[in-house]
């Protein structure tokens, strides 16, 4: 596997059990927190005269200009996945309704339009886990608790390595239980339990490696919060941190599993193959930072490239334009890396082509999901309006922030 040294091995592996992630605590934080299920109130800003109109770059250019395909198992898998996660975390009716609208299964469906129902369900459940897990570090109780963050990651790593106790559906640690079921499933074939060939040890090592990159990014993010350095970093330092904490690396490898892609070591270890993963992670996070800009302002989220560039003296429109340039540069970096890749041979190249398709679908699915589900807008209709007009309306009193 491609590896990098974060310089924080001791921090990532040690720590006493500082936090009990109980169902009651999860439910309480979902009701009061600022995560993906929290819907900011837009209704008080209906007058266009009170808005600053920001023009977005064309986010559907280059690799994103292709039509998306939806997995045929989407409808049936969505119903089961939504019901299951709500049951596991003992969610109330309001949260369950919001979760249906967030629609993690749609996201998984665009990521892997040809995978089995079992693989699609696993991908949808991974999305549910990732957002619940991430919210703890992003705006939740671990966002400024470095020791607590390191400890929670250590407990989750034990699950991945098979050294943790078995959790149950009625466990006091529902997020850990969900992750344990995912580890169980990913060790199997994407066709289902005891169906087809189980995942190789080589693939599972890659799956663990991708999650380690994610967790190292989360620790770096929390450390930045604790040190109060959100707006003192340069764009490159921000990208280096966010491309890990975004969670795109494990999501991408999870989609490799959904398609039965097991990259040979000579492919997986090639620097340009990893560079393509980095590039697409950058594209996803930069697009996300534009579309989430208003929501991040409302919720006080500092981890946003537009906000970072504004802190450096740019106007909001100038900052958005600059992020648009960065996104287009991602495509140039992608094609440059692609042109320099060697040929590995028929079987390895077939796996590589599958990997490249997964990367493209991941970026496209993330983009479409943000518009379709109204994730960052007051409704799906508002998301459709933003996509059509490329106009993002920000209350003037907020635009000055």
Curated annotation (Swiss-Prot):
Mg(2+) 1 binds at residues 134, 139. A motif (DDXXD motif) lies at residues 134-138. Pathway: Secondary metabolite biosynthesis; terpenoid biosynthesis. Residues 1-21 are annotated as: Disordered. One of its GO terms (molecular function) is terpene synthase activity. Its cofactor is Mg(2+). It comes from Fusarium proliferatum (strain ET1). Keywords: Lyase, Magnesium, Metal-binding. Belongs to the terpene synthase family. It catalyses: (2E,6E)-farnesyl diphosphate = (1R,4R,5S)-(-)-guaia-6,10(14)-diene + diphosphate. It comes from the Eukaryota. SUPFAM superfamilies: Terpenoid synthases. InterPro entries: Isoprenoid_synthase_dom_sf, Terpene_cyclase-like_2. This is (1R,4R,5S)-(-)-guaia-6,10(14)-diene synthase. Catalyzes the conversion of (2E,6E)-farnesyl diphosphate (FPP) to yield the bicyclic sesquiterpene guaia-6,10(14)-diene via a 1,10-cyclization, which requires the abstraction of the pyrophosphate from FPP to yield the (E,E)-germacradienyl cation. The only accepted substrate is farnesyl diphosphate (FPP). Mg(2+) 2 binds at residue 139.
């Amino acid at each position: 596997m491609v590896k990098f040294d974060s310089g924080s091995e001791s921090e990532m592996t040690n720590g006493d059990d500082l936090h009990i992630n109980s169902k009651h605590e999860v439910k309480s934080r979902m009701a009061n927190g600022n995560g993906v299920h929290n819907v900011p109130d837009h209704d008080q800003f209906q007058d266009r005269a009170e808005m600053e109109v920001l023009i977005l770059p064309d986010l559907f250019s280059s690799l994103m200009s292709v039509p998306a395909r939806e997995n045929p198992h989407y409808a049936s898998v969505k119903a089961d996945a939504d019901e299951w996660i709500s049951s596991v975390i003992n969610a109330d009716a309001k949260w369950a309704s919001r979760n249906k609208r967030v629609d993690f299964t749609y996201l998984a469906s665009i990521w892997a339009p040809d995978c089995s129902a079992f693989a699609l369900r696993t991908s949808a459940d991974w999305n549910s886990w990732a957002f619940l897990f991430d919210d703890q570090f992003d705006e939740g109780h671990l966002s400024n608790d470095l020791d607590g963050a390191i400890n929670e990651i250590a407990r989750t790593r034990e699950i991945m390595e098979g050294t943790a106790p078995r959790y149950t559906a009625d466990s006091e640690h529902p997020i850990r239980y969900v992750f344990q079921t995912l580890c169980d499933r990913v060790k199997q074939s994407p066709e289902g339990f005891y169906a087809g060939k189980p995942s190789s040890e080589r693939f599972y090592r890659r799956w663990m490696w991708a999650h380690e990159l994610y967790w190292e990014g989360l620790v770096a993010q929390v450390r930045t919060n604790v040190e109060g350095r959100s707006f003192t970093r340069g764009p490159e330092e921000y990208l280096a941190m966010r491309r890990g904490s975004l969670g795109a690396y494990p999501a991408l490898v999870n989609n490799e599993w959904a398609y039965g892609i097991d990259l040979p070591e000579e492919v997986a270890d090639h620097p340009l193959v990893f560079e393509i993963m980095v590039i697409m992670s950058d594209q996803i996070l930069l697009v996300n930072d534009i579309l989430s800009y208003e929501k991040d302002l409302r919720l006080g989220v500092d981890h946003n490239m537009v906000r970072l560039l504004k802190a450096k003296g740019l106007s909001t429109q100038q900052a958005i334009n600059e992020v648009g340039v960065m996104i287009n540069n991602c495509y140039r970096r992608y094609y440059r890396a692609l042109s320099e890749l060697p040929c590995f041979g028929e079987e390895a190249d077939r796996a590589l082509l599958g990997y490249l398709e997964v990367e493209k679908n991941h970026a496209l699915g993330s983009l479409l999901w943000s518009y379709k589900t109204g994730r960052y807008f007051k409704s799906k209709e508002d998301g459709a309006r933003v996509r059509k007009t490329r106009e993002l309306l920000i209350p003037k009193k907020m635009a000055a922030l």
